[in-house]
Amino acid sequence: MTDTQPPMEWPNFADIPLEEALPMSRPKGQALSRFIWWDGEIRKAEKQSVHYYANALHYGTAVFEGIRVYPTSRGPALFRVKDHMRRLLGSARLYGMSIPYGVSELSQGAVQVTRQNGINHAYIRPLAFFGYGPIDIKPKQACAVTVFIATRELGTFLGEKALRNGARVTISSWRKFHHSSMPTMAKASGHYANSVLAAHEALDRGYDDAILLNQDGTVSSATGENVFFVREGQLCTNDETSSIVPGITRDTILRLAEEAGVRISIKAFTREEMMRAEEIFLTGTAAEVTPVREIDGVEFRTGKDTLGARLQRAYLATVTGKDARHHDWLTWV
């Protein structure tokens, strides 16, 4: 449902037109790394392998991040790379992984592998995993931890049409696991089996993505994104008690909205509250800021004058360096 209401005014937005904010020449494919950062060294990606008895392959004992590289007027830049690496180390601690690298070393590794692969618009995947060892669910006793940082080209995640016009989303029949069962704040590979079930269900129903509810019926997240909605000019999202991964894109949007003077509510919300919203959008490193135009046949506002669209433009202007107020979030290659 396109926007037919008069635009609300937020005078502090650096409101750059979408065509200007969008990075130019987004890659259409997902070409892989020629080089990879592997335990502190740049190596040829084709030479690296994982043992078929690696603990992570059997039990999902890996933690990871996703970081975007964007083209800017000063060359390619990584967005909030240090924040991503801090979260990686936090996830590793929750799973008992000992990683011998700090935030600075890992961030520099991401810069090095980006430079070595000669890319300017990509997705970076740092991943730490428990490797070869006995068949055991106590991997920290006997399995070495390997850390690698790989890259691949990535344009839009849910598609150019969804980014511009909105995604079609369904409410999954699968529920999100509770934060008392698993550390939902950790970005761990095993956790995403839950998301795979929901994503496959959405695919089978003909939708772009799915939103998962918690056991109590409150909203958790989409398959890999945080959920925002707008009602009466107020921006709403849920908090950590809703079993979410507190996204770095989510944090960026909240900070940009606060700077613009937008009223914000951060608390658990129900499916009913979300479905009464005027507009809904999803945020994530891969998905960026993607509007939702429909949930199970119910339409929501989209269009250039919605708050979500303004935040989308502000976000894209920030990650590409066009809005200089947050150059401190960019690490140039």
Residue ranges and their predicted role:
Residues 1-101, 108-112, 135-333:
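Helix-start/capping segments and mature chain N-termini
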Residues 107-121, 125-134, 152:
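Short, acidic/charged, Gly/Pro-enriched secondary-structure junctions
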